[in-house]
Amino acid sequence: MSNLNLATLDISEHANLPTSSEVLFKAKADKKLSFESIAAAIGRNEVATAAIFYGQAKASEEDIAKLAQVLEIDHAHLESLLSGFPDRGKSVSFPPKDPLIYRLYEIVQNYGYAYKAVMNEKFGDGIMSAISFSTTVEKETDKDGNNWAVVTWRGKWYV
């Protein structure tokens, strides 16, 4: 895989990320691994794997062991960095400065009430969990050669 297609991290632009992020991203870049390949090696999906790198998801003991192996990071060191609880939501300023992250917020801003209305009609009054939750990102190319991002959110419904 070309190094141009690898997500890397300039920690100076992300002051609120945990120390584990710098360690994980450095190993990822050094080994030239994509989130797809790391996810396959640890048995998680790409977004869940990336969330661990950004300190937004808790790594299990199994995740830590597999990440240490695939990234060639000392297990005890990685365990000490990842054994705590994530400090979710702190890594992005509001409003977001990154255009892609801003567009994700914009989608919720523009369609949030529409999502809510349709979900309430389908499921009744309740909420979609962001804890019992999974998400995927797929690439779709149409007949004209245009690339489309397909983002799926799957959350348990609570009444």
Curated annotation (Swiss-Prot):
Catalyzes the reaction of cyanate with bicarbonate to produce ammonia and carbon dioxide. GO terms for molecular function: cyanate hydratase activity; DNA binding. It is an enzyme of class 4 (lyase). It comes from the Eukaryota. The active site is at R103, E106, S129. The keyword Disulfide bond does not apply. It comes from Blastomyces gilchristii (strain SLH14081) (Blastomyces dermatitidis). This is Cyanate hydratase. NCBIfam families: cynS. Pfam families: Cyanate_lyase. SMART domains: Cyanate_lyase. Keywords: Lyase. PANTHER family: CYANATE HYDRATASE. Belongs to the cyanase family. It catalyses: cyanate + hydrogencarbonate + 3 H(+) = NH4(+) + 2 CO2. One of its GO terms (biological process) is cyanate metabolic process. Its EC number is 4.2.1.104.
